[in-house]
Amino acid sequence: MRVRAVLFRVLCALVACIAVASLTACLGPQPNRNPTAAFLALPQAGYAPLTVELDARASRDPDGDALTYEWTFDSADSASGAVVMRTFYAGTHTVELRVSDNRGGTDIATESIAAQAVPEGYVAHSFAWTAKGVPQTCTFLIPWDLYQMYKGRIRNTAAESYVYGDYVIDPLDDPTIEDYAGVFWARTDSVEAFVDYALAFVQGAIRYRPDPTRQEWPWYPLETLVAGEGDCEDSAILFVSLLRARGVSSSLAFVDTNSDRLPDHVLALVPVSEPWAARLTCSASLLMLDGVRYAVAETASDGLPIPLGCDPWGLSPDDVLQVWPF
């Protein structure tokens, strides 16, 4: 009897499966469901000309159908593809995305892009870098006359004649540097995070370029920002200037990296408390100078992220030949 019961249950299951399959066949294909259009615009606002990445890969089709992507800009120009780049000039612009499946289903999403005109007397310089593995961007407005004034200052080529600290404390660019530092400060939540963020900026957004022959002189921060590149002293001056603008202590240091007792490199030093030091990646590389614990900030990394406190030179206190504190 038990065998018969088992066979009966199996037979019933088979009949049910056949019935469901037959019902589906009788009813025909299920009705198509419309896709959902969605996209990201990065950045969504900035100074013109503003180049924006439009990414529609967040769009979805509930039936799993393949999608096509059609873009319309200000009800005029168009483009296609899941990811497109578009440059917008001054004004507010409307971007429309239409996604379609292969069975006639469609959906539309729209966003506005605000491209702000650059104020007269300024130039806009955009920067891109990575901080703790996350891509970052910003655009700084640079007063053109102030930049030209710094660029036009007469200098000589004798490196030993330079007081590098003078390039940090010059007062004319203080309000401008304070604005730039304020942008970074608003993106962080502590002094430690701000220092890390500013260091990542100068390492990643400012290309390392040795001074050309017969041009061995430092640059003021605005010169480095306009060029987007600089030698070790240029990036260190910029970094220390950003910290100074927010009242964060630091120093420029002229150091000996090859043990010949002659200065050959400029970097920054940041005084750190014992708890801060314990949180650093390279806490064993700290320098003690006059009883103060300093973390090395190597700004001329040529794009390589070197965390605060990591000393690529293996410096000792005797290798620090001159310091300009701020």
Locations of regions flagged by a protein language model:
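Hydrophobic/aromatic-rich core segments of domains that either
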Residues: 234-326
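Surface-exposed, flexible coil segments in extracellular/virion-facing regions
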Residues: 68-86
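Short, solvent-exposed loop/turn segments at the edges of extracellular beta-sandwich modules
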Residues: 100-105
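Proline-centered linker/hinge motifs at extracellular inter-domain junctions
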Residues: 32-36
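C-terminal edge beta-strand
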Residues: 109-116
